[in-house]
C-alpha cells in the first residue's frame, strides 16, 4: 500500500503553495489520491509557511506525522520541521544555511526560539541549522543537501535569465529533487508544472528546466532512487483537485447562485474569488431556448464592509435571487443585526461562515471550531435560523446547494458552517464525486403570479407564507414587527400571531429535513465507546476508528451535521447503550458538548480538544481515546502541528 506524506516549508511568498500543488498534481497524474493543506502566517512575506500532503491509493482521511520527506527551502523550515521526518525518511535542505543561528531568523516566533535553544543546550550543541540536521540524522533521517544557489546559477545560464528572475524557481529545484528521490517519474512532475502554470509558456519552460537540473544533480550526487513509484489505481482517469473554498463556490454556482457579496477576510475570500473567475456560465438546451441566450452571469460584489455585504444580499434575496455572503468570525460579528432582520423579515439568505482561531483577530490563518454557538445564537431577540456544518470537501459541495434549498423552502437564514482547514486544504476528486443532480434545486413557495390581495406574511398552517419577488406585488419588508401585509404594528395579539408563525416553521424544518442530513452514525453501532463531533474533524475521526479497531478498540462516531435545530432525539438514539461518550472539538469551551447537554439527557464523560490552530490528526484522536479509556481523564488536549 502506498502511503506517502511530505512537508514543503519555506518563507511566506516563496512559492510554497505552488510547490504543494505541483506535488499534488504530480501524484494525481500518476494515479493516486491526495490530501494537502497549506499552513501559513498572517503576513504577506517572510514568515514560515508550509504545505503538508499525504498520498494514498484512496482519498486520504487525515494528514500524517511523521512524514517521509521534508523539503526545507530556508533555515527556519529546517528548525521548524527537522523532528517531523520519520526514521528512513529524507530531509532536503541547503547546506549553505548550516551556520544560520536561531536568533538570526527574525520572523521566527520567540517561544519557538527559546524551545529550540533549550533543546540544543541540553545536547551541548550550538543553536544553528547544522545542529538540527545532525539531530534529524541521529533520529534516522537521510540527509539530502542541495546547493540551491549554485543550482540557480546553472538555471540562469541555461535560460539566459538573471538569477533574480530564476530564483522564483527555487521551490521547483527543491521539490523536483525530493519527488525524484521518492520515485516519482520526471515526466509527471513536468506535466504537473504545465498544468500549474497553464498559459504561461516562459514560466513553464523555466520550471521544467529547473526540474532537469535538479534531477541531474540528484542522480550524480545520490544515484538513482531505490525504487520507482508504480502507477496508482486512478491513472488515466479524469480527476480534479479542489479546495473547500473551490467546492463551496462550485456548489453555490450549480445551485443557482445569483448574487454573492463579500468583504475580504481570511479564509473566506478565496471562495468569492473562485466565483469571480467563473461568474459567466454557459447554458444550453430548453433553458437557453427559454431565455434566448447561451450564458448567464453571477453578480459578485466586493462591498465596503461586512454590514453592507449581508444587507446587500438581503435585498437581492427579497428580489428573488439566490443570494449569499461569505465571511469569517470577525466579519460575522458585524452581520449579527442583519441576521436578526432576515429572521424577522423571513428573507432566504445563505451566510457561509468559515471558522478560524479566535477570539478577536486571534490567529487569522489558523483553523478552529470556536464559532459554533456564535452561529446558532447570532442575531438579537428570538432569532432562530438553520445552522449546517459540513464534515468534508464533498459534503461542502452538496451542502452549499442544500443551504439555498432550505433557505428558500423555509424562508429563513441558513448559516453554512465550515472552517479554515476545509477552506485551504486540497483534495483529489473524481467526476462522480460531484453530481449536482443528487440535490435538485427547489425554491419552496415562490410565486410567479401573486394575487392582487397578496399578503407577504400570510398566516398559514406551516408558518411558511407564499413568497413573491420584490416588485412583483405590493408588499412591505421591514425589521419591525408587522401584520400579514408587512405593515408595522405593535398590537399584542398580532405580535403573538407572528411570533408563533415563525416558531411553527422550525417544527416543520425538524419534520422535513431528513434524519440523514441531521446526523450520521459511523463505525461500530454496537460499540460501548462513542465519539461525538461536528465539522472537519469527521475524516480524522473516521481514520482513528479504523486505527482503534486494528488495536482491538471498538467505537462508534456520531457526526452532528444540523446544529440548529439540534437533532436531540436522533443523537440520543445513536448513542443508545453507550457507556463512554467522548466529545471531539476544536474549541476549549466544549461548545458541542453544551448543546448535547441542553438538548438531550446525555452527559459526556470526556473530551478531546485541539486549540493550537492546526488541523486535527487521526493519530491524535486514536491516541487520546486510548488514553481516556486507560486513565479516565476528563479532557485530553492534543497539540501536534508546527
Curated annotation (Swiss-Prot):
A Gene Ontology molecular function term of the record: pyruvate synthase activity
Top-level class of the enzyme under EC nomenclature: oxidoreductase
Thermal activity profile: Optimum temperature is over 110 degrees Celsius.
Upper classification of the organism: Archaea, Thermoproteota, Thermoprotei, Desulfurococcales, Desulfurococcaceae
Catalytic activity as recorded in UniProt: a 2-oxocarboxylate + 2 oxidized [2Fe-2S]-[ferredoxin] + CoA = an acyl-CoA + 2 reduced [2Fe-2S]-[ferredoxin] + CO2 + H(+)
Short sequence motif named YPITP motif, residue ranges: 263-267
Oligomeric and partner information: Heterodimer composed of an alpha and a beta subunit.
Gene Ontology BP term (one): response to oxidative stress
EC numbers on record: 1.2.7.11
Key words of the record: Oxidoreductase, Pyruvate
Physiological role: Catalyzes the coenzyme A-dependent oxidative decarboxylation of different 2-oxoacids such as pyruvate, 2-oxobutyrate, glyoxylate and 2-oxoglutarate to form their CoA derivatives.
Annotated positions binding substrate: 266, 356
Protein name: 2-oxoacid:ferredoxin oxidoreductase 2, subunit alpha
Organism annotation: Aeropyrum pernix (strain ATCC 700893 / DSM 11879 / JCM 9820 / NBRC 100138 / K1)
pH dependence of function: Optimum pH is 8.5.
Domain comment in the entry: The Tyr-Pro-Ile-Thr-Pro (YPITP) motif is important for the turnover of the reaction, presumably through its flexibility and mobility.
Keyword Heme: no
Amino acid at each position: 500500500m502506498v502511503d506517502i506524506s511530505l512537508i514543503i516549508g519555506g518563507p511566506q511568498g516563496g512559492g510554497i503553495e505552488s510547490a504543494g500543488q505541483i506535488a499534488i498534481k504530480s501524484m494525481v497524474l500518476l494515479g493516486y489520491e491526495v490530501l494537502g493543506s497549506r499552513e501559513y502566517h498572517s503576513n504577506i512575506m517572510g514568515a514560515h509557511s508550509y504545505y503538508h500532503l499525504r498520498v494514498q491509493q484512496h482519498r486520504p482521511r487525515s494528514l500524517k506525522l511523521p512524514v517521509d520527506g521534508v523539503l526545507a527551502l530556508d533555515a527556519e523550515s529546517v528548525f521548524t520541521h527537522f523532528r517531523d521526518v520519520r526514521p528512513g525518511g529524507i530531509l532536503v535542505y541547503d547546506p549553505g544555511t548550516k551556520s544560520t543561528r536561531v536568533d538570526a531568523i527574525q520572523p521566527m516566533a520567540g517561544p519557538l526560539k527559546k524551545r529550540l535553544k533549550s533543546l540544543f543546550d541540553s545536547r551541548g550543541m550550538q543553536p544553528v541549522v547544522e545542529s538540527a540536521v545532525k539531530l534529524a540524522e541521529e533520529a534516522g533521517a537521510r540527509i539530502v543537501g542541495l546547493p540551491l544557489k549554485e543550482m540557480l546559477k546553472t538555471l540562469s545560464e541555461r535560460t539566459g535569465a538573471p538569477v533574480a528572475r530564476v530564483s522564483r524557481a527555487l521551490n521547483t529545484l527543491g521539490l523536483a529533487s525530493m519527488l525524484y528521490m521518492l520515485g516519482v517519474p520526471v515526466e509527471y512532475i513536468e506535466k504537473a508544472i504545465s498544468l500549474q502554470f497553464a498559459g504561461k509558456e516562459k514560466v513553464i519552460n523555466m520550471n521544467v528546466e529547473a526540474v532537469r537540473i535538479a534531477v541531474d544533480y540528484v542522480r550524480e550526487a545520490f544515484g538513482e532512487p531505490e525504487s520507482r513509484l508504480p502507477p496508482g489505481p486512478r491513472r488515466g482517469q479524469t480527476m480534479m483537485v479542489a479546495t473547500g473554498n473551490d467546492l463551496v463556490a462550485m456548489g453555490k454556482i450549480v445551485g443557482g447562485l445569483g448574487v454573492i457579496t463579500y468583504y475580504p477576510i481570511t479564509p473566506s475570500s478565496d471562495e468569492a474569488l473562485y466565483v469571480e473567475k467563473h461568474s459567466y456560465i454557459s447554458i444550453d438546451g430548453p433553458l437557453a431556448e427559454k431565455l434566448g441566450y447561451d450564458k448567464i452571469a453571477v453578480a459578485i460584489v466586493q462591498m465596503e464592509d461586512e454590514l453592507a455585504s449581508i444587507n446587500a444580499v438581503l435585498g437581492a434575496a427579497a428580489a428573488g435571487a439566490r443570494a449569499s455572503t461569505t465571511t469569517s468570525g470577525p466579519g460575522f460579528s458585524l452581520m449579527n443585526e442583519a441576521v436578526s432582520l432576515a429572521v424577522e423579515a423571513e428573507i432566504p439568505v445563505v451566510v457561509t461562515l468559515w471558522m478560524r482561531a479566535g477570539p478577536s483577530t486571534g490567529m487569522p490563518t489558523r483553523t478552529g471550531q470556536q464559532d459554533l454557538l456564535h452561529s446558532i445564537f447570532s442575531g438579537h431577540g428570538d432569532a432562530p435560523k438553520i445552522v449546517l456544518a459540513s464534515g468534508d470537501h464533498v459534503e461542502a459541495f452538496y451542502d452549499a446547494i442544500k443551504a439555498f434549498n432550505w433557505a428558500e423552502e423555509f424562508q429563513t437564514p441558513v448559516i453554512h458552517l465550515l472552517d479554515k482547514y476545509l477552506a485551504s486544504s486540497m483534495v483529489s476528486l473524481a467526476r462522480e464525486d460531484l453530481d449536482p443532480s443528487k440535490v435538485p434545486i427547489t425554491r419552496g413557495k415562490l410565486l410567479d403570479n401573486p394575487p392582487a390581495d397578496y399578503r407577504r406574511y400570510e398566516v398559514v398552517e406551516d408558518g411558511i407564507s407564499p413568497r413573491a419577488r420584490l416588485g412583483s406585488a405590493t408588499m412591505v419588508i421591514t425589521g419591525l414587527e408587522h401584520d400579514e401585509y408587512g405593515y408595522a404594528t405593535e398590537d399584542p395579539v398580532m405580535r403573538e400571531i407572528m411570533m408563533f408563525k415563525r416558531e411553527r416553521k422550525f417544527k416543520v424544518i425538524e419534520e422535513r429535513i431528513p434524519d440523514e442530513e441531521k446526523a450520521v452514525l459511523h463505525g461500530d453501532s454496537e460499540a460501548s465507546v462513542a465519539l461525538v463531533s461536528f465539522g472537519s474533524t469527521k475524516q480524522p475521526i473516521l481514520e482513528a476508528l479504523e486505527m482503534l479497531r486494528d488495536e482491538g478498540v471498538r467505537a462508534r462516531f456520531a457526526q452532528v451535521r444540523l446544529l440548529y435545530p439540534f437533532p436531540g432525539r436522533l443523537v440520543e438514539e445513536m448513542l443508545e447503550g453507550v457507556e463512554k461518550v467522548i466529545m471531539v472539538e476544536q474549541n476549549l469551551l466544549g461548545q458541542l458538548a453544551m448543546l448535547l447537554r441542553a438538548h438531550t439527557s446525555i452527559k459526556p464523560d470526556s473530551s478531546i480538544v485541539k486549540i493550537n490552530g492546526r488541523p486535527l490528526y487521526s493519530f491524535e484522536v486514536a491516541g487520546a481515546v486510548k488514553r481516556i479509556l486507560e486513565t479516565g481523564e476528563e479532557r485530553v488536549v492534543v497539540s501536534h502541528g508546527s
